[in-house]
Amino acid sequence: MIEVGDYKVKEGLYYTKDHEWVQVLDDGTVLVGISDYAQKELGDLAYVELPEVGTEVNKGDVLCELESVKAVSEVYAPVSGEIVEVNEELEDSPEVLNEDPYEHWIAKIKPSNLDEELKELMDAEAYAKYLESL
């Protein structure tokens, strides 16, 4: 784990400038979640509007919405592909994203262009440097 001020950055993941993370699984699918920075900026999460399984998303599309006590925020798809699973635990317990944003994912995507799109994401070290610039 890399620490940048009050924020933690988990190594072994890829990150976007919008503070989503991507974990590539052995079967070629990816898990998508939000970073520690994102959950702290949002504050206490009250509701997660999960995407529909089977939906095709393009990189940059809205993946879901998170409602916190402060605001409603959109989470963007960091890669293109088909949503094959959502974390239904978040429907009843959205606060788990605040408690441990790296253990709790939002959606699993079967990517359609992973090799190219991963090149556009940051590794943990690059993301930590990005956070330092904010």
Give names to the regions the model predicted.
Residues 34-38, 61, 70, 87-90, ...:
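Short, well-ordered turn and helix-capping elements at secondary-structure junctions
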